[in-house]
């Protein structure tokens, strides 16, 4: 345990004691709320809000608010919060991560702080891992909030902008991290305040916080638009790379997931393309195509990392086993996979707006999270987000038996042992959950189970539509379920079946809606739930006697958290359960860390393939390997954040300026001052040193491209005072500004100012993002010159930003004076003294703001970038920067017989 871990652990006891005191306060007043009728209980909300208006703090209200929610939940859902759930809610209110084991009721816990913070009316965001959970939780948990008078909504991926805007007005809003993040980016691309949907970032509760803030944190959210196409290179490089040999032409580091082209490979590529130097500046884009083709060949495997369905390459998320329809890898990698599989290559797109999840969630005034597995990443949560991890005790003691790992020489022997174990336990009726690491492995196990005559259900990328129902029934007698991953499934595996899920499904099939038929739904819910609980309880008791849910892990994941999430599905709420991992020396994790020593020992001892070993040393080696991968991934996420922090400072400047314009800031004063600065810079550029060295003609010509100069060049032939010249030009420019406003009219001029500012700012920002992407890709080479890449990125990125802002100012002024516009009548641009809209001339059409077909790139739970189109259906291309690279001017690099990255 390192120093940080010891410090964090030392404070846990104090926090737990404080949480226990809060539980005592809530329990001491519970009977007061039990005695209230429904109207009195619901009326507490108005009372709490009045007390907040009078200056009381949320901390003072907490015991009463939690007692109110506890009683409301009991009446509406039939669930009373346990003491440990009260503890979890208090931990969330105090901006911590509540680590609660699977089945401890995290969703119910979220009700408590959401209600308390929702009393402020500033908006609470509850972040889920998918749309399904956002919808279901907003409907079911929303029943309690609505009973107490709070407004509830959900942001779903197919919602139009106006519906989103209304949803954000609710006291509590459910949605996925991607939807919240993309709405933020879209708001900062809006051309008017009415197009913005979010109203701030007050308080967020992140469900499955480790998946969202850790697994998905390596890859930013990106909104892309069309860019120049260069699709012809992808199949060309796929052909070239198919002829290259590993370790002869290139090297692969599977742990780091990187490739390096060797000197011989460079020569082969140059000969095939008919070029002299692959690393000349004109050929720079080709390097990206080459690297992506090698990655597609060596690092991405069909039916594991992706599947090909209907002529499309669909990504498979290792952590969930789902295909993500419409999602694509960024940086040209998806096109390389399409070329490899000989399917249609989709279009390329360029970055229009981007932010990392780390920097998005760090914008919230208050942040909290829930998960069953956060302790292994505790120091990361503290360092990056300032969040503590509080392990909440289970409501009942955990009695699950976690058996030792069984390790086999070969994968075939391992699978045979799994099947034999499943057959034996299935005959007794014990429910079994088998976790696999890939779609291919789940299908292989499924085939073996079929041959063994074991009926089962499969949860993976090709069967995810019915996953909630499969999970809900996975605890029934005799159920056998194969799943690629159990993280974020959102449905509990309850021995005997999940009565709440069955009730919700039953009422939905009957056409009852918790939003539209609240009273009828509540009555039907109580009766239907009682029926399913009675049915499930009898089977629950029988399955308990069989040993509870048996979890089999078919191999270890890179992250200990994923293994713990699988194990955690068994033994919920004090139920019996058992788990065991079956491993082989051919498993991916074992293969990465060279198990040859163990293999040689097993051969020397003449151990048969079907004889496993139980070795504490091997188990320690596996855990050590997992820790290495986790540490490596943490460094990657920290590195992403360090670089994005540079962009984040620039982003806040740009987005802050945009927001001021949208909110009606005094644009005229700023633009007049900008005009003065641009004119002064133009004068000083040509009036350096002695007056006889000034180039007045060039000065007049250049400044004349910015605004119509009214000064006579000949009158300044003998001028020797640069300050006088500057003041005269400033005065002349301001007179020109006045004339321009007189020509257009005040209202039209104000609109033109706003349109020009937003249009030019957005375009320059897009170009800057492109340049920064290009800088980021090549910055690692600075290490070869003994320079810190991050320091160089900060310095050069800052210089590029300053240069972009100077260019932005000059272009804005030039547009204001030189743009030919057409005006026409528009209602509502101007109001009369009474505030009523009147008709006035406006700029028609808006300045250079074409409608773009956008795409959205976001991380999956593995942290890889994927892209979906605006309609959310058909996959599109992504922000490839080949066009920008081909235009970039860089010194040619000499070929050497060494690695090229």
From Swiss-Prot:
Record keyword Plastid present: no
GO CC term (a single one): cell envelope Sec protein transport complex
Any one GO molecular-function label of the UniProt entry: protein-exporting ATPase activity
Gene Ontology terms describing biological process: intracellular protein transmembrane transport; protein import; protein targeting; protein transport by the Sec complex
Biased composition (Basic residues): 882-901
Binding of ATP, residues: 85, 103-107, 492
Enzyme class label: translocase
Gene3D superfamilies from the UniProt entry: Helical scaffold and wing domains of SecA, P-loop containing nucleotide triphosphate hydrolases, SecA, preprotein cross-linking domain
Compositionally biased tracts (Basic and acidic residues): 871-881
Enzyme Commission number(s) of this protein: 7.4.2.8
Keywords: ATP-binding, Cell membrane, Cytoplasm, Membrane, Nucleotide-binding, Protein transport, Translocase, Translocation, Transport
Main location: membrane
Cysteine-cysteine disulfides: none
Pfam families the record matches: P-loop_SecA, SecA_DEAD, SecA_PP_bind, SecA_SW
Family matches, as SMART domains: SecA_DEAD (SM00957), SecA_PP_bind (SM00958)
Stored SUPFAM superfamilies: Helical scaffold and wing domains of SecA, P-loop containing nucleoside triphosphate hydrolases, Pre-protein crosslinking domain of SecA
Annotated family: Belongs to the SecA family.
Subunit structure comment from the entry: Monomer and homodimer. Part of the essential Sec protein translocation apparatus which comprises SecA, SecYEG and auxiliary proteins SecDF. Other proteins may also be involved.
NCBIfam families: PRK12904.1, secA
Protein name, per record: Protein translocase subunit SecA
Species: Cutibacterium acnes (strain DSM 16379 / KPA171202) (Propionibacterium acnes)
Encoding gene, per UniProt annotation: secA
């Amino acid at each position: 345990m390192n120093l940080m871990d010891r410090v964090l652990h030392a404070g846990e006891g104090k926090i737990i004691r404080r949480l226990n005191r809060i539980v005592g306060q809530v329990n001491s007043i519970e009977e007061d709320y039990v005695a209230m009728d429904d109207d009195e209980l619901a009326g507490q909300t108005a009372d709490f809000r009045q007390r907040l208006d009078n200056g009381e703090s949320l901390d003072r209200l907490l015991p009463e608010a939690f007692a109110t929610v506890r009683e409301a939940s009991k009446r509406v859902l039939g669930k009373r919060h346990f003491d440990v759930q009260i503890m979890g809610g208090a931990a969330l209110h105090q901006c911590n991560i509540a680590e609660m084991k699977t089945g401890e009721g995290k969703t119910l816990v979220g009700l408590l702080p959401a209600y308390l913070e929702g009393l402020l009316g500033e908006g609470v965001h509850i972040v889920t891992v998918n749309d399904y959970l956002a919808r279901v939780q907003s409907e079911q948990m929303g029943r309690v909030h609505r009973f107490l008078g709070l407004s509830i909504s959900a942001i779903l991926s197919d919602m139009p902008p106006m519906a989103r805007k209304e949803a954000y007005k609710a006291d509590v809003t459910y949605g996925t991290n991607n939807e919240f993040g993309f709405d933020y980016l879209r708001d900062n691309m809006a051309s008017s305040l009415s197009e913005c949907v979010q109203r701030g970032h007050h308080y967020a509760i992140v469900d499955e916080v480790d998946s969202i803030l850790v697994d998905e944190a390596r890859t930013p959210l990106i909104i892309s638009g069309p860019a120049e196409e260069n699709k012809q290179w992808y199949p060309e490089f796929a052909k070239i790379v198919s002829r290259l040999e590993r370790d002869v032409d290139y090297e692969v580091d599977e742990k780091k997931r990187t490739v390096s082209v060797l000197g011989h490979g460079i020569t082969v590529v140059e000969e095939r393309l008919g070029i002299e130097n692959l690393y000349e500046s004109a050929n720079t884009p080709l390097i990206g195509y080459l690297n992506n083709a090698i990655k597609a060949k060596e690092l991405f495997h069909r039916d594991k990392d992706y599947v090909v369905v209907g002529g499309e390459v669909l990504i498979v998320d290792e952590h969930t086993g789902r295909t993500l329809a419409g999602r694509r890898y960024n940086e040209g990698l998806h096109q390389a996979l399409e070329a490899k599989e000989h399917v249609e290559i989709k279009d390329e797109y360029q970055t229009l707006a981007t932010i990392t999840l780390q920097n998005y969630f760090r914008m919230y005034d208050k942040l909290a999270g829930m998960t069953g597995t956060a302790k292994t990443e505790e120091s990361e949560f503290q360092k990056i987000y300032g969040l503590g991890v509080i392990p909440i005790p289970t409501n009942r003691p955990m009695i699950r038996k976690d058996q030792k790992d069984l390790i086999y020489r070969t994968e075939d022997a391992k699978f045979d042992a799994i099947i034999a174990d499943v057959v034996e336990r299935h005959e007794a009726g014990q429910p079994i959950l088998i976790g696999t690491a890939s779609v291919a492995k789940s299908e292989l196990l499924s085939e073996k189970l079929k041959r063994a005559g074991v009926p089962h259900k499969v949860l993976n990328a090709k069967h995810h539509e019915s996953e909630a129902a499969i999970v809900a029934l996975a605890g029934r007698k005799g159920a056998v379920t194969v799943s690629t991953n159990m993280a974020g499934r959102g449905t509990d595996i309850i021995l005997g079946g999940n009565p709440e899920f069955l009730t919700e499904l039953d009422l939905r099939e009957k056409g009852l809606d918790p939003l539209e038929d609240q009273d009828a739904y509540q009555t039907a819910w109580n009766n239907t739930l009682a029926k399913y609980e009675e049915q499930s309880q009898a089977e629950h008791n029988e399955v308990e006697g069989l040993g509870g849910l048996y979890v089999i892990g078919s191999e270890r994941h890179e992250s200990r958290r994923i293994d713990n999430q699988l194990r955690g599905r068994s033994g919920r709420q004090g139920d019996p359960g058992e788990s065991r991992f079956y491993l082989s020396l051919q498993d991916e994790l074992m293969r990465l860390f060279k198990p040859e020593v163990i293999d040689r020992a097993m051969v020397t001892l003449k151990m048969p393939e079907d004889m496993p070993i139980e070795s504490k040393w091997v188990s320690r080696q596996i855990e050590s390997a997992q820790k290495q991968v986790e540490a490596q991934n943490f460094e990657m996420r920290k590195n992403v954040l360090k670089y994005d922090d540079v962009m984040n400072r620039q982003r806040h400047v740009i987005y802050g300026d945009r927001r001021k314009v949208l909110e009606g800031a005094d644009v005229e004063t700023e633009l007049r001052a900008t005009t003065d600065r641009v004119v002064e810079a133009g004068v000083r550029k040509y009036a350096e040193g002695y007056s006889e060295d000034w180039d007045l003609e060039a000065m007049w010509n250049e400044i004349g491209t910015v605004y119509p100069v009214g000064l006579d060049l000949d009158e300044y032939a003998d001028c020797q005072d640069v300050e006088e010249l500057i003041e005269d030009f400033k005065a002349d420019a301001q007179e020109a500004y006045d004339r321009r406003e007189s020509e257009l009219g005040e209202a039209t001029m104000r609109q033109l100012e706003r349109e020009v500012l937003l249009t030019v700012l957005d375009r320059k920002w897009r170009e800057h993002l492109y340049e920064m992407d290009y800088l980021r890709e090549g910055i690692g080479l600075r290490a070869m010159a003994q320079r810190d890449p991050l320091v160089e990125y900060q310095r050069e990125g800052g210089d590029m930003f300053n240069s972009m802002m100077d260019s932005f100012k000059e272009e804005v002024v030039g547009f204001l004076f030189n743009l030919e516009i057409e005006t026409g009548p528009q209602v509502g641009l101007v109001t009369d003294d009474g505030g009523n809209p009147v008709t006035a001339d406006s700029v028609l059409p808006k300045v250079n703001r074409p409608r773009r077909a956008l795409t959205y790139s976001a991380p999956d739970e593995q942290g890889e970038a994927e892209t979906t189109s605006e309609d959310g259906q058909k996959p599109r291309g992504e922000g490839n920067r080949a066009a920008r690279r081909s235009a970039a001017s860089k010194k040619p690099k000499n070929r050497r017989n060494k690695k090229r990255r």
